[in-house]
Structures are given as C-alpha cells and as structure tokens.
Amino acid sequence: MKTTAEIRQSFLDFFHTKGHQIVASSALVPENDPTLLFTNAGMNQFKDVFLGMDKRPYSRATTAQRCVRAGGKHNDLENVGYTARHHTFFEMLGNFSFGDYFKKDAIHFGWEYLTSPRWLGLPAEKLWVTVYETDDEAYDIWNKEVGVPAERIIRIGDNKGAPYASDNFWAMGDTGPCGPCTEIFYDHGEHIWGGPPGSPEEDGDRYIEIWNIVFMQFNRHADGTMEPLPKPSVDTGMGLERISAVLQHVNSNYEIDIFQKLIAKVAELTGEKDLSNKSLRVIADHIRSCAYLIADGVIPSNEGRGYVLRRIIRRAVRHGNLLGAKEAFFYKLVPTLIDVMAEAGIGVKEKQATVEKLLRLEEEQFARTLERGLALLDEALANVKKGELSGEVAFKLYDTYGFPLDLTADVCRERNITIDEVGFDREMEAQRLRAQSASQFGMDYNNVIRVEGCTTFEGYTASESLAKVTALFADGKPVERIEAGQSAVVILENTPFYAESGGQIGDSGYLNGQGFSFEVKDTQKYGQVFGHIGELVSGSLTVGKSVNAVVDVKRRHNTSLNHSATHLLHAALRQVLGEHVVQKGSLVSDVALRFDFAHHEAITKAQLVEIECLVNQQIRANHLIQTELMELEAAKAKGAMALFGEKYADQVRVLTMGDFSIELCGGIHAKRTGDIGLCKITTETAIAAGIRRIEAITGENAMSWLHQQQALLAQSADLLKSDVNSIVEKIQQLQDKAKKAEKELQVLKEKSAMQAGSDLARSAVKINDVSVIVQKLDGVDTKSLRVVVDDLKNQLSSAVIVFASVVEEKVNLIVGVTSDLTSKVKAGELVNLLAQQVGGKGGGRPDMAMAGGTQIENVDHALSFATTWLKENL
C-alpha cells in the first residue's frame, strides 16, 4: 500500500519524466492577489503566467500545492468533519502547461499516470469521466484515443443557473482565468450508495472525483465578459488526500495514514473513546489549516484572513469542548502534526514555538466566553419557535461572545435547527453602517492595463532617462492622446522611476518634452509594465512620443534612507526580541518609515532603547550597502531573509549591510549605512493581536524632530521656572502639592456634606413610619454623597435616602436603604429605575447603589418619580 508521501512523490516524478519543472508549493497567502483570501488551487501561483503578465523559464510545471478552503468562493468549512472528503487544508497535485501542450496531451498524461502499472495502476474499468457539454474535442480524445466507453463519458452542461456556470466549467474566482474542464471519477463499487455524475444520486459516495483537468482558455472580467487568453493552457488538480484514500482502500479521507495519528492524539487529549466521533475529524483537520496558516504569517484577528483563522480555531475549540476537554488542548497537537507532515514531506517545525503560542493564546481567550455564550445559546434554543434561531441572537453571540456564525450553525445543526441568516446579515450590516467611515477611492487600473512587453527599469543607476511612450490610459481606458489638465497613466518603454513595491512608495517627478510637461505623482507596476500616474501640466502627449523622464531626486534620496533604515531595524528587532520576529508590512516614504512585525507581547522601554541604539550603531559603522543578483535558492542558502507576502523571481537581488543584515530586496537604498545619519523611533504600538508597529524617522527629519523636542523641553522648563535637567523633579513637586491640596479639599467637602446631612435629617418626611429624603445636591461629588448617605442612615433608624447631583455636565444618583427595609426596597432596583429617567444605568448592593446619566434636564423628573415610587412601595 502506497503512503501519502509516496503518492505525492510519484506524481511529481511522473510529470518530471514528461518534461515538467517541479515547482515548490507557494504560501497559503496568495502573492500580490487581493481577489483571493487564501491559495485554494495549484494554479494560483501561476495566475499571471496564464494571463500573459509573467514569464517563466519553463512552459511545463508540476506542483504539490498546500491549499486552504475556508472563506470566499471556495468555502468548505461548514462541511468539514461531517463528510468523508471536505477539508479546510489539503494538498493539490497539479500539472500545468503554459501555451505548450493542450487537451490531447493533458488527457493522455492523466490516464497514463492513473492506470499504468508503473505508476498508480488503477483499474481502467473503475474510472469514469465528464466533459463540458459542448466540448466535443475532449469527448473524442477520451472515447476514440484513450478508449473510454461512451457509457462512462458524461456530458455536463450549465447546471448552476447561469451561462458557463457548470461543474465542468472551472473558474478560480469571480474574475480571472477560466475554461471548460474534464473530470475523472473513481467508482468505489456497488456496495456504496451513489450514482454517476449528473444523476440524481451523484451526491453519494460511490463515484468520487479524483482529478480535474482544466483547459484554460479565457480571462473573465468583473463585468462577466470573457476574453481569450494569449495562449491556451492547461491547469489540473488532484486532491492528494482523495487519491490516497482510493489507493489505501478506504472510503473516507480521514482514514488515510496522515490522519490516523492526528485523530488518535486528539482522542488522547480529550479522553474520547469513540474514534468515529465527527468532532475528532473536525479537530484533526483544523489543526492542519491553523498551523500552516500561522506558519505562513496569518495572525488571528477580527478581519480578513485573520478572522477566517480565528473562526477555524474557535470551531476546533468548541468541538474539543463537546468531547469533554477541560483545559487548553488544541496547541498540544502541534508536535504530532509536525511528525505527521514531516513524514508527508512538509513541516512547520521552524515556526513551532510561534504556532503553539498563538494557538494557546487564542484558545485561552475564547475559553473565557465560550461557556457563557453556550449557556445563552442553550437558553435561546430551548425557546426556539418554528425550528429557527433568530438572527438577532446569532449576532449577539457573534458580537458579544465571539461566536462565528458557522460555530453557532454547528450547534444548531446538531439540534436540527436553522439560523435566520437574513436577520443576522441585517444586524451585521446595521453595525457596519454604524462603524462606517467615509473613504475615497481613486481609479483602479489593475484590471484595465493590459500591455504587451515590459518596461525596462533603469533606476538603480540613473535618475533621468530618455524613453518612449508605449501606452496611455485615462478615465479607466486606453487612449492615444491626452491634453493639458488631464489625469492619466503613462506607460514607458524604459524608466528610471521606481514603482511601488516591497513597502517603498513609487517615485515622483516629471516627464518632459518639446511643448509638454507631465507631472508624475506616483509610479505603480501593472504586470510587467510601469505606470507613471499623474497629470499633464502643459501641452499634449501622444503614444509613441519620446520623453525625458526625470525623478525627484531629493524625495527618492530621503526614501532610500528610510528604506535602508528599515532593513537595519528588522535585523535589530530579530537580534533583541528573537528570531520569531518577521515583517508583516511596511511603508517606506520620503518622510518616515513604518514597520509592522510579528511579536506577541509589549516591547519594554529598555528593549526599545536597545533596538534604537543597535540601529544607530550600525549607521555609525558606515557599512557599504552591497547588492548582488543570484538564484533564489542560493540566496536563501546564504541566509537572506525572504519576506512573507512578497513575490520573487527565480533570480533575486540580495542586499547586505556588513554582516548585520542580509535580505532579498528590489528597492532603492543608500550607498552606505552612514548616509542615513540618524534613526529615531517615534512610536511603538500594538495594531492587532500578535502584531506590533514601529514608526521612525531618519536623516534631516530625525534631526528636525530632535530640535523640536529640545525646544519643547526648553519651553516646559520656562513654564516651570526650572532648568531642563530639573524638569522631572519640579513636576514631581507640583504633583505632590496637587495631591495634598486635593486631600484637603476632599476633607472640607465631606465636612460640608455632613453638615448638610444634619440639616437634611431634620427635613425628612414620613411615609408609613419610614423617614424618606429625596433631594438634589448640585456640585457634590460621588464620594461626598456616599459619606452623607452613610451618616444619615446612622442618624435615622428606618430610612430611604435618594440624592441626585450634577457635576461637570453629568448626573450622579445614589440610593441608600437602612437594613430593616431592604426586603421592601432594594437600592439597586430603585437606582436603575431612576437611571432610566436620565439616560443612564447603574447598580449596587440592596442597601447602597449608585448610577450615572447624561440627561441633566430630567433630574427633577427622576426625583419626582422616586417620591411617587416610594409612596407606592413602602
């Protein structure tokens, strides 16, 4: 029996013999593709190749790609654990042709690998295929060349309610590459229920799709239109876990070798004896996706990819709760996962400490609200009518207790109850509108600019170049000519302008020529071409004209200093805080630098000083900043850091600063570290769970900042009538005096209040032999009010005291009740009723309670209400 690791290797070996380049799996976070939450198919890393925007030194490739499907269009989360084949994390085996072979070879390759005794050796009679209804070419290849009988070839049309919406018309997302496909199914046999694809029983488990071969012919735009791709290509995908189940003679993916150890470990940690329990499957699946997402740089959060990760973690924790887990358990699966996936050929061992820590923190945080949330849900489900949980309750669970909707849906499904998702969405939208802030978006040219060829970048050695205009874009479309005052994007054949990348802003400057001048305000990269974004200041500009491209040198110089300082800062952070520190984002401009990084606790002042000193030490060392082009793998072997989320070519630019910093970087830098002059950290904050942010300035900006701080100190010293070195001592003296004066004032207030209390005791009215005082005492703070109430309770044997006070535009309410009356009048109940009259809330003990409010105009009404209520209840 072949192991999963052996199957993976045999697939790669087979296609290598067919002239395919073996390409490593890309990260789970797609590189430079905002249309995807996660890598969900093998072809994601080749999207730009299919679109003709990127070129590789090979035209055939094969991969074993790590994938996650738990958000967006491809979302398997709700099915995971309840079916035999759905996963959040899986591996997709694939072979790809970039304008090389097409349908004939793709089909023959697939059949040979599956049926040849040298490879998988599956019985041919066990295999069925489907083709797109109008794809006669694919049908004939299967039938006439491969020899699959017509009764085992099924045509599938548009079965999803729209043109090209079919099980046999594949698309990566709402936009992007797409085309007809042919799928290969394995027949498990008559002993398992189910029918062939296209039949009413197709959802059964007898016929299982094992391979999808996509004939990539089109690029779908946001408006639904499709244009032919430059060259027809092939994209195939075969789920490793599915084919392993077939070859290991089991009907469920959860019974294959890589899942058995994980399920056994979950059972051990939770004490579950029944190894068929679906919760074991859920947790075994989820630890794979969670660990690999964290290893690839995703941090649990409340938005985007981080929220999907949080949903998966919380779903796993809840299933652990179902199994009886009494303490944090999920993170304890990581060592077993590393062992299992190491056997399978991939691992997260290098990130083990970070993965375990984040999982443990997230689990412990959710555990604090899980029990209370489940109690609320149980109560709500007990009162459900018509078998549906209200959207309002589901939203409260989400908003207050951190229950993702799919977690609530899991609980409801176990009790055959549905959720009012329309109501939930309505509540979510209402919250979004409440929190919405205005935002402006400029013209997005990413899906508009499609230009043949590429722009040659000359900016490493030049700041001025002669260049030819190859294309113009204005108002979201290509044009041949622009006039003065018109905003546009200018594409050049060559350019000294740096296009925004790696956190560094794009260059600005001018494109000048005879009779015209174009101001470049930003530079962006669109595929292989550089777009110079700006406005034509004078004259007219047409495609084909020559321009003198001149970069704003001062702005670029300041930007380069900040970029070089960012590299030093990154290295210093790793040296002081630990090797777990990785870049999570950056912004390098001519004004300042911003650096986001993974770190799970606050940075101390001493650490921050050490980091800053280390950076400036390297600046003073005046290292030569060297760049070298080399192969990506050689650069990594040399120790160069490849930053998460960046897309690198096979040949990369390695930037070194002495022996202190070595990174892959395509940005513009200083010539020596000494050019930076000075680096000053201005702020350090947390921006999300596990993510910190440092902002800093360099060079002249840093000196200017220091001068401002020095002036501020001098001004403060003048106000304090002190010298600069004695400011802290002087402030401490003033604080001590202020505290002393405050205490003396409080004593006077309390004396005054007690005197007022004696007067108030004489004014008490009787209601059924109970002394009642209801008064407004303006300007009396809450502490003094408590003193007066306690004094009056001691003076009066049986009493209820109600005071209202307005201090600094806020209403303070206090109710005191002597112990003999708390069975009749509870201070907390009465003060809450009064608080409602003034737009507030409060609470406390039965004999003493306080509240606050904001509606000053209703104070008299509240006191009148108190008198009436006491007459009715005493």
From Swiss-Prot:
Q: Report the GO molecular function annotations.
A: alanine-tRNA ligase activity; aminoacyl-tRNA deacylase activity; ATP binding; tRNA binding; zinc ion binding
The UniProt entry, under SMART domains, shows: tRNA_SAD
The UniProt keywords, alphabetically, are: Aminoacyl-tRNA synthetase, ATP-binding, Cytoplasm, Ligase, Metal-binding, Nucleotide-binding, Protein biosynthesis, RNA-binding, tRNA-binding, Zinc
What are the boundaries of the signal sequence?
A: none
Binding of Zn(2+) occurs at 563, 567, 665, 669
Q: Looking at the UniProt record for this protein, which Gene Ontology cellular component terms does it annotate, in alphabetical order?
A: cytosol
What EC numbers are recorded for this enzyme? Answer: 6.1.1.7
PROSITE patterns, per database record: AA_TRNA_LIGASE_II_ALA
User: Which cysteines form disulfides?
Assistant: none
Top-level taxonomic group: Bacteria
Annotated GO biological process: alanyl-tRNA aminoacylation; negative regulation of DNA-templated transcription
Pfam families per the record?
DHHA1, tRNA-synt_2c, tRNA_SAD
Q: State the top-level EC class.
A: ligase
What InterPro entries does the annotation carry? Answer: aa-tRNA-synth_II/BPL/LPL, Ala-tRNA-lgiase_IIc, Ala-tRNA-ligase_IIc_anticod-bd, Ala-tRNA-synth_IIc_core, Ala-tRNA-synth_IIc_N, Ala-tRNA_ligase, Ala_tRNA_ligase_euk/bac, DHHA1_dom
According to UniProt, the reaction catalysed is: tRNA(Ala) + L-alanine + ATP = L-alanyl-tRNA(Ala) + AMP + diphosphate
The cofactors named for this UniProt entry are: Zn(2+)
According to the record, how does the cofactor bind?
Binds 1 zinc ion per subunit.
Where would you say this protein principally sits, based on its record? cytoplasm
Spell out the subcellular localization from the entry. Cytoplasm
* Domain statement: Consists of three domains; the N-terminal catalytic domain, the editing domain and the C-terminal C-Ala domain. The editing domain removes incorrectly charged amino acids, while the C-Ala domain, along with tRNA(Ala), serves as a bridge to cooperatively bring together the editing and aminoacylation centers thus stimulating deacylation of misacylated tRNAs.
| Function in brief | Catalyzes the attachment of alanine to tRNA(Ala) in a two-step reaction: alanine is first activated by ATP to form Ala-AMP and then transferred to the acceptor end of tRNA(Ala). Also edits incorrectly charged Ser-tRNA(Ala) and Gly-tRNA(Ala) via its editing domain.
Q: Which family does it belong to?
A: Belongs to the class-II aminoacyl-tRNA synthetase family.
Name this protein carries in UniProt:
Alanine--tRNA ligase
| Species in which this protein is naturally found | Pasteurella multocida (strain Pm70)
> What's the source species' lineage?
Bacteria, Pseudomonadati, Pseudomonadota, Gammaproteobacteria, Pasteurellales
